[in-house]
């Protein structure tokens, strides 16, 4: 990571950094502060550092631990934000850990107090005949199978509206990651 940060600095780029110690800190409350102090010590001084990537698409059961990680990082390094990306609204209630998508986003904002609410929504689907493929996990299989059921996944603007509503209610800015690179079952 240090080499990448140094290269990005030379190129005028900024990085939201991922480090395995952050992932370990989520599940290890006993060593959380120690792990995160080491992360901040290693990276906070790099001008190319934009922020710390905590996790992608968490279930609501993880929100209390994510809130603790976010707060520790904010206390140790108030200059660089801690980043968490949420599921889109086509995730199941089981994946979310909440009965509705709005409830999931609202609980995230209330529990984690993020600097920004971020989510991705990939609604352009190839729509090819479904083949039997094991993607390695139940979650990935669900996403893969759902992708072949529709050509244009519905709910893109409903997703924006749910997040916009929570954003306005909590005075937290939001961003959406849209599909720009064709991969897996997704198309441009």
Predicted feature descriptions by range:
Residues 1-188:
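Glycan-processing catalytic domains of CAZymes
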């Amino acid at each position: 990571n240090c080499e990448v940060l140094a290269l990005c600095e030379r190129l005028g780029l900024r990085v939201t950094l991922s480090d395995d110690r952050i992932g370990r800190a989520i599940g290890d409350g006993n060593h959380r502060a120690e792990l995160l102090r080491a992360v901040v010590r290693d990276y906070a001084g790099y001008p190319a550092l934009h922020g710390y990537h905590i996790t992608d698409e968490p279930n609501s059961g993880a929100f209390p631990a994510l809130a603790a990680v976010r707060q520790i990082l904010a206390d140790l390094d108030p200059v660089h934000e801690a980043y968490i990306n949420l599921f889109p609204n086509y995730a199941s209630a089981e994946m979310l850990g909440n009965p509705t998508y709005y409830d999931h986003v609202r609980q995230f904002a209330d529990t984690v107090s993020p600097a920004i609410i971020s989510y991705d929504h990939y609604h352009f689907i190839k729509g090819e005949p479904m083949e039997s493929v094991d993607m390695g996990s139940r979650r990935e299989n669900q996403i893969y199978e759902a992708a072949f059921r529709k050509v244009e996944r519905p709910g893109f603007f409903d997703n924006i509206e749910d997040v916009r509503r929570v954003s306005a209610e909590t005075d937290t800015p939001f961003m959406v990651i849209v599909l720009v690179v064709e991969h897996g079952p997704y198309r441009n």
